[in-house]
Amino acid sequence: MEKFSQMIAAELKLPAHRIANTLKLLQGGATIPFISRYRKEATGGLDEVQIGDIQTRYEKLCELSKRKETVLSTIEEQGKLTPELKSRISACWNATELEDIYLPFKPKRKTRAEAARAKGLEPLALLLMMQKENNLAAKVRNFVKGEVKDEEDALKGARDILAEQISEDERSRNLMRNQFQRQAIIQSKVVKGKETEEASAKYRDYFDFCEPLKKCSSHRLLALRRGESEGVLKVTIFPEDEDMCNERLQRLFVRANNACAHQVEEALTDAYKRLLKPAIETEFAALSKEKADEEAIRVFAENLRQLLLAPPLGQKRVMGIDPGFRTGCKVVCLDAQGTLLHNEAISPHPPKSEYAQAARKVVKLVEQYKIEAIAIGNGTASRETEQFVTSQRYDREVQVFVVSEDGASIYSASKTAREEFPDYDVTVRGAVSIGRRLMDPLAELVKIDAKSIGVGQYQHDVDQTKLKASLDQTVESCVNLVGVNVNTASKHLLTYVSGLGPTLAQNIVDYRTENGPFESRRQLLKVPRMGAKAYEQCAGFLRIPQAKNPLDNSAVHPESYPIVEQMAKDLNCTVADLIKDKELRSKIDLKKYVTDTVGLPTLTDILQELDKPGRDPRQKIQVFEFDKNVRTLDDLQEGMELPGIVTNITNFGCFVDIGIKENGLVHVSQLADRFVSNPADVVRIHQHVRVKVMSIDHERKRIQLTMKGLNN
């Protein structure tokens, strides 16, 4: 592990001892949120991203180490493992370089070169490569026997062997990689006959596309690969100057001007076209796809983070409405804890148009269930339903919000929803989800597969294993950042708490059901299978608002309770007094409480938590209204200024909901009056913005917007 620590430290430019401490904690079962929050002295204050990078790099090095063992044993079984080769492999920590070393020894399917070797033509190939023989014809005749028909057959077989050797030579491959790295071009052409198909229209921009690979953005590359997988596009990668590649390869291998050298030249041309170029193209296609995947996953994870940390309404009585025309609007009433109290359908819109009856029902329900806020899904009939709801007069002040429906239909048909509401259909479950999303987006969204939430960029085209790992880590990070009320949280929310997982989460819910609410964090140790390690990892992130010890409703870890108690004792007060009285806290000298294991970083965190125990890091929610005059694409005009909500962020800009079916695009160049390289630096998911309509493409239903000069 020490060697890995040194290597990771050099790569990430961090002190090796901090890397070693972090790896030790990770291998000891500590989670990333726990290490970041409660082990700052050991890590030197590394954040979750840095700890995640260390973990990822360590896992890659472990994989590479296992691969080296496989390579060594395979070559040893062949009897070809020399001390020099063993030393090279042992010292190699680059995956590409390792595969290059292994390539000549790698078991292959039957190749042309293998067939030529079987005919006994390897000595002839060696003779050609030496390029010293002046009487080649006489030498070649010696190989015309058995399966070798004539001199040309012998030379062809020898060239096949040379072509394979050249293509597997590390120098050849590195030369080609350098050429691709500097000047590779990615090109796409429409597959003949596909240009007129309606399904191909979305790829029109790529029917005749060409640009340097290093300039091809992740979203373009993923679009190209999707078009290729759908059979619409033919995508190729090649070096801009192929003649230069051939010239450089000739300098490496052609050392004379005789008949042997001419055969080597011919073999080299074949090696380039048939073996080397396709191999490096495949390598760069995979590398560029991997980079595009990483970028798309990063964008998705950041968008998901913003969505999960969206402002909550909090514990208020809410009416949730899943709007619709033909099937009507499904209405549910929830109490402040999100429990379903009532459900029914109303039809204020065509075709039934029972406006007056629907209005009476909504007004009556608001009064009957003391509704404080109404959440309306942003799908079909959303604008009409919003206008209908805001047009009524209620007996109290009622806030109206439009809530994203993305993933609600998937949740409503899921096993989770069936378990929660076995006696209700999908429409009721969907409306409940919409209402609960307003109350606490994080608690509700964790029940839905993150890929269904709709804030990704080509999420179905990227590496699904990496995507899931990244999104799970993002959800875990958000849940632990906010903290969880152990007495009200669902098992889905508890699953993401540091150190728990599905089994312990279910055990906590079962224990709570059988024994009533938890009264202290220590009581968690009575939960079946809750060991000391799991308790250490989860306790600081679980909150108990009604606990006798106020620290149980804070982010102060139980291991630090003695420190806080000592602080209170030194000031002749209780812990509760210390939390309530800012003046008392100002008298605390943190240096007095520094020990070998607890330093100023942890003590500073404790003091900040005492200032606002259990504080919610999420922002306050704001009411938003769309422009009442804009309902469809036909209502838009160039130059219009409109309010909107950011629904998705990509590398090339952001999409904004302006109250109609189609979202508008604000290109990255139109986000601000200054240069913007990363849209996420300027906007966030669900941000309220003002935009101006630049252009409308009615045929493709695309809207170009700008935020320039609008004081966002």
Region locations from a protein language model:
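Low-complexity, acidic/Ser/Thr- and charged residue-rich accessory regions of DNA metabolism proteins
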Residues: N142-E151, F209-C210, D243-L276, I280, ...
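A glycine-rich phosphate-binding loop feature that marks nucleotide/adenosyl-phosphate handling sites
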Residues: N178-I185, I321-F325, G379-E384, V403-I410, ...
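Short, ordered loop/turn segments at secondary-structure junctions
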Residues: Y38-K40, M129, E240, P323, ...
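Accessory alpha-helical DNA-binding modules that contact the DNA backbone or grooves
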Residues: T31-I32, D47-E114, K119-K149, H342, ...
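Duplex nucleic acid-engaging cores and interfaces of nucleic-acid transaction enzymes
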Residues: Q50-D53, L64-T74, Q78-G320, R326-S412, ...
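Long, charge-rich intrinsically disordered scaffolds of nucleic-acid metabolism proteins
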Residues: E97, F401, G407, S412-V482, ...
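C-terminal accessory/binding modules appended to enzymatic or scaffolding proteins
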Residues: K13-L14, P311-L313, E476-D510, K628-V666, ...
